[in-house]
Curated annotation (Swiss-Prot):
Keyword line: Cytoplasm, Methyltransferase, RNA-binding, rRNA processing, S-adenosyl-L-methionine, Transferase
Binding site for S-adenosyl-L-methionine: 35, 37, 62, 83, 113, 136
Catalytic function, reaction form: adenosine(1518)/adenosine(1519) in 16S rRNA + 4 S-adenosyl-L-methionine = N(6)-dimethyladenosine(1518)/N(6)-dimethyladenosine(1519) in 16S rRNA + 4 S-adenosyl-L-homocysteine + 4 H(+)
The encoding gene: rsmA
Role according to the record: Specifically dimethylates two adjacent adenosines (A1518 and A1519) in the loop of a conserved hairpin near the 3'-end of 16S rRNA in the 30S particle. May play a critical role in biogenesis of 30S subunits.
Name of the protein in its database record: Ribosomal RNA small subunit methyltransferase A
Entry's family note: Belongs to the class I-like SAM-binding methyltransferase superfamily. rRNA adenine N(6)-methyltransferase family. RsmA subfamily.
Uppermost EC category: transferase
């Protein structure tokens, strides 16, 4: 990975953003959680933290007016931008043509809700070649987008996303923490996450009411001994579904013991097989322990009718 990114293109500043928005008749909307980055230094920092190089294929979700898009293209990478808002999706190629015309052939724009994206409707990512996600995600749907993309794209190898600071803290939280919860554990099924920096409110237009932070994620390799269960295998997802059911139940009643919270899913015998004390709470379990419990339930038979 490159340690530095050459500043070769014209990236968007505050005046550029406001002019583009005015020319296109676009206003940021709360519906889509739109806050546009107006600071070139911030988007270059995001791309640098992501380690993007010219050899990479990048997905961006929610490109907006193109601030981060241009910073990604500046590296020489090929990218696909997924934008839910039709006017913004229509405008983006023109912005790239205006500010970085040599990069237009490396950009594909898909007008689609990221929660509906699949390898079939975004064929650029349908093969086995690994790709990375780099995005300033809409705060209200950041976690669902990440978990959905990781489930549907086995070749999503890493991501660097900017999200609300509180969301970043939860995504990277460890067992035993007060903020450790469903997002933390489910993300840990796929790989490892860490918070790698904070972003102030003044780099956005309009300025949000919350601070932002960067989360970096690396997916487990298929042969990684740290990978829980069959997280990276070609199975039908049955084990993951059971693990996620356990997680949802355990954190849906956070203050209850595992025995109480999981009484309709996990028979008492399963705790013994997994070597897990049923008086513990879900917030103390690692993803490996949730997976061990799921395997134990499977070995006991039908986990739907726990006794």
């Amino acid at each position: 990975m490159n340690d530095t990114i050459p500043a070769t293109g014209h990236l968007l500043g505050a005046a550029d953003i406001r002019r583009i928005a005015a020319d296109a008749g676009i206003s940021p909307t709360k519906k889509f959680g739109q806050n546009f980055v107006i600071d070139p230094g911030t988007v270059r920092r995001i791309v640098r933290e992501a380690g993007v190089t010219a050899a990479d294929h990048v997905m961006e979700v929610g490109p907006g007016l193109g601030s981060l898009t241009l910073a990604i293209l500046e590296t020489g990478a090929t990218m696909t931008a997924v934008e839910i808002d039709p006017p913004l999706a229509e405008r983006l190629p023109g912005t790239v043509a205006e500010f970085m015309p040599e990069a237009t052939s490396r950009l594909t724009v898909v007008n689609r809700d990221a929660l509906t994206v699949t390898p079939e409707n975004v064929p650029d990512f349908s093969d086995d070649a690994s790709f990375t996600l780099v995005a300033n995600l809409p705060y209200n749907v950041a976690t669902p987008i990440l978990l959905t993309l990781l489930e549907r794209f086995d070749n999503l190898g890493s991501f660097l996303v900017m999200v609300q600071k509180e969301v970043a803290d939860r995504l990277a939280a460890k067992p035993g923490s007060k903020i450790y919860g469903t997002p933390s554990v489910k993300l840990a099924w796929y790989g490892t996450a860490e918070r790698v920096g904070t972003i102030g409110r003044n780099v956005f237009w309009p300025a949000p009411n919350v601070d932002s932070a960067l989360v970096k994620f690396t997916r487990y390799q298929a042969d990684d001994p740290a990978a829980p269960g069959t997280a990276n295998s070609t199975d039908d997802g049955t084990q993951r579904e059971l693990v996620f059911r356990l997680i949802d139940a355990a954190f849906g009643q956070r203050r209850k013991t595992l025995h109480a919270a999981l009484k309709t899913i996990a028979p008492s015998e399963a705790f013994s097989i997994a070597g897990i004390d049923p008086t513990r709470r879900g917030e103390t379990l690692t993803i490996a322990e949730f997976t061990a419990l799921a395997k134990a339930i499977e070995s006991c038979g039908d986990g739907d009718e726990a006794q």
